[in-house]
Amino acid sequence: MSLMKGKKGLIMGVANERSIAWGISQKLAEAGAELAFTYLGDALKKRVIPLAEKLNSKVTFNSDVEKKEEVVKLFENIKSEWGEIDFVVHAVAFSDKSELSGEYLNTTRENFLRSMLISCFSFTEVAKEASKIMEQGGSLLTLTYESTKAIPNYNVMGVCKSALEASVKYLARDLGAKGMRVNAISAGPIKTLAASAIGDAKFLYKWNEDHSFLKRNVDIHDVGNSALYLLSDLANGVTGEIHYVDAGYNKVGMPDPKNFS
């Protein structure tokens, strides 16, 4: 497949082979895209570089989205390497694990602000810098999770994702005049490193499997396929969208009574 042949893009947020960002990376590489990757610190460097090499990528950067100067430097480095960029995948999020369980009411100011900076505002900052080296037809994609409802053990991350989804719409408006598209994928629960921080995750997976329309959970390859579409020219008319990849769960009105019999 050569859907992405000649296109270059940045992947932010790969942690290991179970990462949603890795599933997206594989599909993009299979379609002919040339990829660059970010990591944070030596521990992730040891994981990310071998994965990048599997996709014939030698372009990797250490970058901390908490620091504005590092985001600016990241895209300066990409400009030096490639000149221009066609797409960015933002799969970056953080919250103190201890504050995901219990009541949202007990979220600390420090964790709220840090979680919002990393999980939400970083996408706006990335979009701003990426747009400087992105030609018309460029595309930005971020990852979210069911933010229209209150999810147990998700707390401040749910609030961050709500803000992130609002950011997608405003960024789509701002960048649309330049021919750039901005979208998000809202995936169902997937067994990733990030998801392991959510309490009662096994119940979440089982509930989604039992009550989604397709009666299964999605995986990183399902998300990768949708990301490929959204980042490719096939989605030239699509922007500002929250695209659900959750086996239909977000459209469930109430569970089927047969599942409780």
What are the functions of these language-model segments?
Residues I49, V156, A177, A187-S212, ...:
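A glycine/serine/threonine-rich, flexible loop-to-helix segment
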Residues R181-K191, L231, Y244-D246:
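Conserved SDR Rossmann-fold cofactor-binding beta-strand/turn motif
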Residues L228, T239-S261:
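Short C-terminal tail/terminal secondary-structure segment
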Residues G13-I20, A93-K128, K132, Q136-K178, ...:
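Catalytic loop of short-chain dehydrogenase/reductase
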Residues S63, K67-V72, E76, S80-E81, ...:
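Conserved mid-core segment of classical short-chain dehydrogenase/reductases
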Residues S2-F37:
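Canonical Rossmann dinucleotide-binding motif of NAD(H)/NADP(H)-dependent dehydrogenases/reductases
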Residues S212-V223, L234:
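A conserved structural motif in NAD(P)-dependent oxidoreductases
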Residues G176, R181, V238-G240:
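Short, small/polar-rich loop/turn modules that mediate ligand/substrate recognition or access, typified
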